[in-house]
Amino acid sequence: MRNSKYLILSSFYFDFNDDLTEITNVKKSFKKQTILDLYRYNDFKIIKKRVFSIDYNLNFIYLPKNIEIIDNFAFYKNQIQILNLSNCINLKIINEDVFFKNQIKHLKLPENIEIIGYNAFSVNQIKILDLSNYIKLKYIEDISFSYNQIKQLKLPQNIEIIKRYAFEKNEIKILDLSNYIKLKQIEIYAFLYNPLTEIKILDDITIEYNNDKDDIWNTFAKYYNDNNKKAGDYKLENNKWKWYPL
């Protein structure tokens, strides 16, 4: 399939720097392509800022194992549906807005990933998000997975902070945070506008909230704080949160 359907790189589509580590120019002849295949180019290290954003309609991308940097907005506003970066062993950072406004349904990241940047995967179509194997990932940045369709969520085992709006506007009903012993802070609006009915959580976590808002997430955060940040199984019953032991 790769030989018959995937784009074969050539000077017809791109200009390269001298050592073939990055694309310096994308030619007009590439505009109608829907597949970007860099898989075999092991010297390729950098995808520059905005290089494939807005004016392209990429459905699939295949990156080389030695890629190190995908810069801000690199694939903004494409139509990528399946994104598998698990072979990219040197990629430790997904920069800001890189895959913002695509159609990603299935996502796999490199095991060594350390940072998922601001707004990196927002406005996609992810339904199941499993980050449990990414042990170096300690922070979920602002807005990084907002406006998806996430129903099932597993966080990294070493997660410490979930930042503002990180999972805003998804489809999470049951949120189980009871296994994350290093989780210390959930910033304001992290799970805003999810249809939450049950939250399992450990004690003494700093959860920020807006006292003037009465949505499901803010009312939970206020109740958790008023309940002395007690570990428990919190359930929404008749539009009110109630505490049960784990």
Where on the chain are the PLM-derived regions?
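Short linear proline/tyrosine/threonine-rich motifs used for host-factor recruitment
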Residues: 25-26, 243
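PEST-like, low-complexity acidic/proline-rich intrinsically disordered segments
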Residues: 1-7
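Acidic, Ser/Thr
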Residues: 27-28, 51
